[in-house]
From Swiss-Prot:
Recorded superkingdom: Bacteria
Enzyme Commission number: 2.1.1.177
Name of this protein: Ribosomal RNA large subunit methyltransferase H
Family: Belongs to the RNA methyltransferase RlmH family.
GO cellular component: cytoplasm
Class in the EC hierarchy, top level: transferase
PANTHER family on file: METHYLTRANSFERASE (PTHR33603), RIBOSOMAL RNA LARGE SUBUNIT METHYLTRANSFERASE H (PTHR33603:SF1)
HAMAP family hit by this protein: 23SrRNA_methyltr_H (MF_00658)
Reactions mediated catalytically: pseudouridine(1915) in 23S rRNA + S-adenosyl-L-methionine = N(3)-methylpseudouridine(1915) in 23S rRNA + S-adenosyl-L-homocysteine + H(+)
Xref: Pfam families: SPOUT_MTase (PF02590)
Length: 154
């Protein structure tokens, strides 16, 4: 299985980039990981921005990729539940598991309809920059759970 992370806009803060690099490196010990950025839309109405950003994200999804949205409306999961989700996808032969983080105005309904699953990291509002690090850390944590490594504590 290959993992792809898609998000809108460049990572602005150096400390966020450092966190991304740290956890991306750890994840790559378990499987291939690719991070792709879709250009952020500026200067338009919210609906138009959302539409254009989702079009750009859609172009980055490989054919047959299983799309998972990070969305405030998504299903809340525990870390062990995410680990189970990752493990099942790997064991069932998913070639590309694609996690997408939307822009400031989220996803269009059409883009949401393409998703295999939608998950939420928190009921609180998180910045789109910080979600990148949180998602990577949770994916890494998931693989340590799968491999019975001493990182996650219950």
């Amino acid at each position: 299985m290959r993992l792809k992370l898609l998000w809108v806009g460049k990572t602005q803060e150096s400390w966020v980039r450092t966190g991304i690099e740290e956890y991306a490196g750890r994840i790559r010990r378990y499987l291939p990981l690719e991070i792709l950025e879709a250009r952020e839309e500026k200067g338009a109405q919210a609906a138009a921005m959302r539409e254009r950003e989702c079009e750009r994200l859609a172009k980055l999804i490989p054919k047959g990729g299983r799309l998972v949205l990070l969305d405030e409306r998504g299903e809340a999961m525990t870390s062990p539940e995410l680990a189970s989700f990752l493990s099942k996808n790997r064991d069932q032969g998913t070639q590309d598991l694609v996690f997408a983080i939307g822009g400031a105005y989220g996803f269009t309904d059409q883009f949401r309809s393409q998703a295999f699953k939608s998950i939420s990291l928190s009921r609180m509002t998180l910045t789109h920059q910080m979600v990148r690090v949180f998602l990577l850390e949770q994916i890494y944590r998931g693989f340590t759970i799968i491999n019975c490594e001493p990182y996650h504590h219950e």
